[in-house]
A protein has these predicted regions:
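Helix-start/capping segments and mature chain N-termini
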Residues: 1-80, 87-90, 95-278
Length: 278
């Protein structure tokens, strides 16, 4: 048995039950077709399936592949929905090599459907005149505002930065260097040691404003050593790229400016506004 588990952290939130009623929201197929309290469950399944396939975990693949696998994952989570009540939660799903599923949970902050499924990411204040005028209805809120720092050390690109697993020491170390607690409204950006580009956040995907558009560090399709920024194939990252909210582009750590506006996202909190702190 491997000494790690595959993981993905998903949002449980009863307000998602209303998502299919909101025609202005461009959700995933899961949240469009199913009245479900689970945020992008289909994308969370897909990321675990890719990881299980990469590591050659046949039993884990069989557990969650196909429509039957997605249903098994939903059924596994159903007992939690009966006991969680109306408050949002962060639920970490763990998948073992033998196909065993487990979960851990904790309370999550309130957020809106607009921050889970934004029609666009608002341009920075200084760039509004240059940006394309977008009359979107699902505008994400900018509160709470996160402080975004750049790690002082580099982090190696490995299969454990590409795929989300319980091997997270590199992310914990990055937060420790800045003395960041998990509850702090703060994030730290990891830096690729090869070229000094931004890889990802310790628990989020970052988006930066470059040439009048939002960009996010490139990630290879499947783990390829030396290709891409070295970051994770996140669920909200995938969603944003598929809908044209951002494109992939390398962003050098040295290009970031103090006070620069940015967005970060993940599968628990949706899209969050932030500012770079140098």
């Amino acid at each position: 048995m491997a000494d790690f588990k595959l993981s993905t952290s998903i949002r449980y939130d009863p307000i998602l039950l209303d998502a299919p009623k909101h025609e202005d929201l461009d959700t995933t197929d899961w949240n469009r077709k199913v009245a479900s309290p689970w945020y992008m469950l289909d994308y969370h399944r897909d990321r675990m399936l890719k990881a299980a396939t990469h590591f050659g975990w046949k039993s884990a693949v069989e557990k969650i592949e196909g429509l039957e696998g997605l249903k098994r994952l939903e059924d596994f989570l159903t007992p939690f929905t009966r006991s969680a009540g109306l408050k949002p939660h962060r639920v970490k799903i763990l998948l073992d090599e033998d196909g065993t599923l487990k979960h851990e949970f904790s309370p999550a902050q309130q957020t809106s459907l607009n921050n889970m499924f934004p029609s666009y990411l608002p341009a920075p204040e200084e760039a509004k005149e240059a940006a394309v005028n977008i009359s979107a209805r699902a505008t994400p809120g900018k509160l709470p505002e996160y402080e975004i720092y750049v790690d002082s050390a580099a982090t190696s690109h490995t299969e454990f930065t590409h795929y989300k697993t319980t091997k997270r020491q590199m992310y914990d170390d990055a937060r420790k260097r800045l003395h960041l607690a998990l509850a702090d409204p703060k994030e730290v950006l990891l830096v690729n040691p090869t070229d000094g580009s931004i890889m990802e956040g310790s628990f989020t995907t970052p988006f930066f404003w470059r040439n009048n558009r939002w960009v996010t560090p490139p990630v290879s399709q499947g783990f390829q050593e030396g290709n891409g920024s070295g970051g994770n194939e996140g669920t909200t990252r995938r969603w944003a790229l598929e809908r044209g909210l951002a494109i992939e582009e390398k962003v050098m750590a040295r290009s970031l400016q103090n006070g620069e506006e940015c967005w970060i996202s993940n599968g628990v909190r949706g899209f969050i506004f932030g500012r770079i702190k140098i």
